[in-house]
Amino acid sequence: MIIDVNTPIPFRLDKYLKRLYPSLTQGVIEKALRQKQVTVNFQKAEANLRVKEGDTIFINDYFNLPVTQHETLVFADAEIKLAKKILTDYLIYEDDHLIAINKPASLATQGGSKINLSIDSALKYLNYQGADFKLVHRLDKETSGLLLIAKNYLSSVKLHDAFKEKLVIKKYFAITYGRPVKNVGIVKSNIGKSKGRMFKITDIDSDNGKLAITYYKLLKSLNNNLFLIEFMPVTGRMHQLRLHAQLLGCPILGDDKYGNKEVMPYSKYMFLHANNIYLSESIVGKEIKLEAKLPFYFTRRLT
């Protein structure tokens, strides 16, 4: 059998074969590759070879199974383009367990009633092509920086549990309007729902909301009452850093939800960036330290 690869996104050969023959085990696929029962472009191929559009897979009668016909799904051009960027322009790190990307601001992590394009919708396209990507945490649409994506179910469980047990160390850079009273400190509060998609600070002993904890450190004084602050959230509540910055009296520049528009200078962007993530060896079997480059508008404000 001759199969012309039709995926524009490069994928591992074993994953591509698994999509064509769902009933086959990984062991059977690898044995077929070792015995040259499956070749790519007339060459012996390893399981981790990435096949792409234009490649040709030759399969002997070894499998003796019909190729599975998948339901045809239609994806928007924007989703396909974003999928390619996730694996190229945005990609910071990749191993067998996960990929890490530098998400730009204005791009949603997940879709919604008014959101047609998101990281999640692009992952659905990649998964349709044979991948098994899964989101394990999220960033606000307006927040840029590091976003981890699991490459399979088992890794997604490990990473999700690590976030839940507060084993993932995250650091954010923010430019704020105003400064906190203390240069270094910790913020503790409850965060509960408010009107619409807004959240609010509630009393620490209140039944409304969940406990939120953030460490912070003032890093640099900038011009026009602007300051660079490092935030390290212990918990991961919705809009936590934005609300805690507001509570400290120094809202994040460009935050149109929790900033004071009448006082704070106008900004097209919100200056909150997920800069660092640290995973200990106990999470995925090795220590991982990641850093995401600041966007151009952020570095421009720092000079």
Curated annotation (Swiss-Prot):
Q: List the signal peptide residues.
A: none
Question: What positions does UniProt annotate as the active site of this protein?
Answer: 140
Catalyses:
uridine(955/2504/2580) in 23S rRNA = pseudouridine(955/2504/2580) in 23S rRNA
Q: Give the UniProt record's GO annotations in the biological process aspect.
A: enzyme-directed rRNA pseudouridine synthesis
Q: What protein family is recorded?
A: Belongs to the pseudouridine synthase RluA family.
Q: Which organism is it from?
A: Rickettsia typhi (strain ATCC VR-144 / Wilmington)
Give the keywords, sorted.
Isomerase, RNA-binding, rRNA processing
User: Does the keyword Iron feature in the UniProt annotation?
Assistant: no
What range(s) does the S4 RNA-binding domain occupy?
11-70
Show the Gene3D superfamilies listed in the entry: Pseudouridine synthase, RNA-binding S4 domain
Record's protein name: Ribosomal large subunit pseudouridine synthase C
- SMART domains given for it? S4
Stated role = Responsible for synthesis of pseudouridine from uracil at positions 955, 2504 and 2580 in 23S ribosomal RNA.
> Which EC number(s) are documented for this chain?
5.4.99.24
In the record, what terms sit under GO molecular function? 23S rRNA pseudouridine(955/2504/2580) synthase activity; RNA binding
